[in-house]
């Protein structure tokens, strides 16, 4: 049985950093209720003039979107934890 060789695309660190930075800027300026990974990837593709819909670019975008959302959730959780606790009144 023949093995099918998969072509691995190497991405240099500068390009990887540029993709992540572009995606992050897009997410920071977007309504997180409306933006999707696909929309972020398409917008980043236009800004970078690069097809990000194929691996390994697609994986980089997915990871950056996930990282961004995880950080946003942590930030919201931290801010909620700093709010004063609501004091329940008891009736006598």
Curated annotation (Swiss-Prot):
Signal peptide range: none
Keywords: Nucleus
Highest taxon listed in the record's lineage: Eukaryota
Domain DEK-C: 13-70
InterPro entries assigned to the protein according to its UniProt record, in alphabetical order: DEK_C
One GO CC term, this protein: mediator complex
Protein location: Nucleus
Subunit structure: Associated with the Mediator complex.
Protein name per UniProt: Mediator-associated protein 3
